Structures are given as C-alpha cells and as structure tokens.
Amino acid sequence: MKTRFAVSALLFALLILPGCSTNPAPANSNTGQPAATAAADPLPSWNDGAAKKAIVDFVKSTTDKSSPNFVTAEDRIATFDQDGTTWVEQPMYSQFLFVFDRIAELAPQHPDWKTKMPYKAVLSGDKAAIAKLSIKDMLALFNETSTGMTPDAFQGVVRDWMAKAKHPRFDRPYPEMVYQPMLEVMKYLRDNGYRTYIVTGGGQDFVRAYAQQVYGIPPDQIIGSTVETKFEMSKGGRGTLIKQPKIQLDDNFSGKAEDINLFIGKRAHIAFGNSTGDQQMLEYTSPASGVTLGLLVLHDDATREYAYGPAQGLPDSRVGTFTQALYDEAKARGWIVISMKNDWKQIFSWQK
C-alpha cells in the first residue's frame, strides 16, 4: 500500500475494477536443517522456470556451509510486502473494506453521520462523493475505527471482521485469498532457517490480527504503518496502551527500508514485493553482504486473478502500481519478475 495507509489510492480504487509424517527428517550436516526428501518439491504450485530456480538456488546457496554465499542463521532474514504480494489487493485494499464495514457498523451509535461528511458519503455508497473527499476526511474514517481502543481490542474487531468478510469478486473469506505459491515460499524459507517478516504499508495492528493464522508469522515479525499510542493505567491498575488519531509510522516507499532498520536492525537477504511502494525495500536488500535476491510479483493473469501494471502494456492501476520504470530497474538490478500467468501453476489453494 502507498501513501499514509494508501488513502489517496482509495479514491481511485472505488471507481476501478469492479496427511503428514510424524518422524522428523534427519539433519543435513551442511545446513543444520532437516534434510528434505530427494523427490519432494518445496514449491509445488510453481511452474519450472527462472523464478522457481532462482528461489531454490538462493536457498541452497545461502544455507550450505561449503558455499561462499553461506548466510549464518542469525542473518537469514526474508521480507514480504503483503497487499498484492502475498494476497489479493484488488479491487481495493482489504483494510479499506474493513473501514467501510466498520463505519456502517458504528453508524447506529452516531445518527448525525447520515448527514455529516465524510461518513455520509460512505454510508450512502456515493462513489462520486467519496472521490471528492480530502485526505483529511479519509484519515478521519480510518481513525474512527481505532481511536480510543487498545491494540488488543482493535485486533479483536479485525478478527471478527475477517471471520465473515468475503472478497467481492471471488466470494471467499479473506484468509483464503492468500497466494498458495507465496505460502510455499515462506514455509520453504522457514524450513531452511529464515525468519519471515511482513513489511506492509497496511496497518500494523490490522495485519497482526490475522498474520499467525494466515501466514504462520507471529505478531513481532509484522512491520506496518502505525498510529501513536498513549500509555494509561486502567481502573484495575494495569498498564495499557490507547490508540491515538495521529500517524506514527508510514511504512511505504522509503519508510519500508527505514522501518526494517528500526524493527529488525539488519538488512534482509531476500525480499518480495509487487509495486513501486516496495521499490526501496528491494533496493535496501540489494547492498546486503553476500548473495541477495529481490523478487516482484507481476499481476498478468486476469482470468485467475487480475491483470494490471502498467508495466509491459498491462492496464494502469493506482492500487499496486507496477510501472515500466520499476520493471526496467528490476531487469537492470537482476531482480526476478514473477509472472502470475507463467510462473504460478496454482494461485489460490481452492483454485484449480
């Protein structure tokens, strides 16, 4: 996501694109990790090709003690953008859908919202009116969904929403809108000693609410945009944090590199993104000592998912923009461009 929770992108988005073994494998003497069965394919949802080979070669090279590219266990860090990289971001970011649904849910407690902007625009579903809202108006909507809440309470509301919300096109719960090939990559990396981090422009507490369930990634390995919190003592004498209506961290563009340093303190050796909002994260990965790998997902499969760029002549989009300039930089830097159409045998676990 881009630009302070990608609020400006919303104005455009509203008008576009309507059984397991119980015996552990023996340890590999070179890597210290469990040895995989020779015939096992760690990435079964990937077609054989340059992208799959690059990932497998990278993992083998960086986990083999005899390799000059060996990366010690403490430095095995992998970063993933979320929206458009690990799950669907079209026709609009999932957090926007959450905000709109939350405003509608809270509306009975605020009768004045029916006639008060920006709430009136959302409640009436007036796309033209929403398109005219200022960034200040949009931030007011976002703040209404979390201000005054503890992080735990907010995450509880998000989990409740996730349990019932469905994607508008595929009519599937959002936890099922994750890309199966990316889940396989995450597991493959973790099986080989890598720590996997989500580095997203979305709300940090929003993603923390479901990341363990969806990705197998714990809350402390989620980096995202945040609002300020204020420490207070509860009536029961317990210290707590209360969300405030002010942006603290904007985890987009260069903010991703800055926050990786802030939260992790080390550069990643492998990074995955899909848009201009991820460019600096990949650029920050590239100078790491030893071998590194940057990968970008190109959405070029309108049949199984969506097609947008505008790189390579694909339709333009303000949601997850992948420009030709970014595509050209990827080629110049040796980053791998993952074609959804050609590199992914299967996109969703339920989709054949």
State each model region's role.
Residues 12:
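Nucleotide/phosphate-binding catalytic cleft detector across ATP-hydrolyzing
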Residues 92, 97-176, 180:
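A metal-dependent, Asp-based hydrolase signature
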Residues 76-91, 282:
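Asp-based phosphoryl-transfer active-site loop
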Residues 58-77, 90-91:
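N-terminal carbohydrate-binding/catalytic regions of secreted carbohydrate-active enzymes
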Residues 1-9:
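Bacterial N-terminal signal peptides that target proteins for export
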Residues 16-19:
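C-terminal motif of bacterial Sec signal peptides marking the signal peptidase cleavage site
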Residues 24-44, 50-56, 60, 75, ...:
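C-terminal cap/substrate-recognition subdomain and adjoining C-terminal extension
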Residues 89-92, 97-100, 209-211, 284:
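Short, solvent-exposed loop/turn and secondary-structure capping segments
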